[in-house]
Amino acid sequence: MRLGVISDTHGLLRREVFDVFREVDHILHAGDIGSLSILTELEALAPVTAVYGNTDDWDVRARVPQVAQLQLDGFEIVVAHGDQFGSPTPDALYAAFPDAEIILYGHTHKPLLTLVDLVVTVMNPGAAGRRRFDILPSVGILELE
């Protein structure tokens, strides 16, 4: 199963995302969506699981949860924006969600892929929206096998 992982769009969905996510089976959005229209556009590509972030308005918060826990292709996955942990770290996320095998988060705008305790994959796809903090926009692809 091929997952598209995105976060921090802040109301901007770049055209490049459509090329990168063209053949994904599911899209996971880790918050700071910015507008419900972003989810509508992503849903045209694949099913979407999303969470809200600290900058999302009440329309977005009414539609998606703060944390999503789901099982895809036999893996226990948690999606959270991460702002509830201040400046989220892989260790803090693992401590909060000890049953997860994969934890996806956003908020920091910094891409990261790491393994915690040799058992839990923690991924931050970076920010896909407007460029901030001198970091280039990014998204991620996660292949489940």
Which residues does each predicted region cover?
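Beta-strand-turn-beta hairpins that frame and shape the catalytic cleft
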Residues: 1-4, 69-78, 116-122, 144-145
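N-terminal active-site segment of His-dependent metallophosphoesterases
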Residues: 1-48, 56-69, 74, 135-138
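Active-site neighborhood of phospho(di)ester-bond hydrolases with catalytic His/Asp-centered motifs
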Residues: 5-7, 26-32, 49-54, 79-81, ...
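Short acidic/glycine-rich loop or secondary-structure boundary segments that cap or lie
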Residues: 37-38, 42, 58-61, 78, ...
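Conserved beta-sheet core of the metallophosphoesterase superfamily
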Residues: 49, 85-145
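Helix-adjacent hinge/juxtasegments
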Residues: 49-91, 95-99
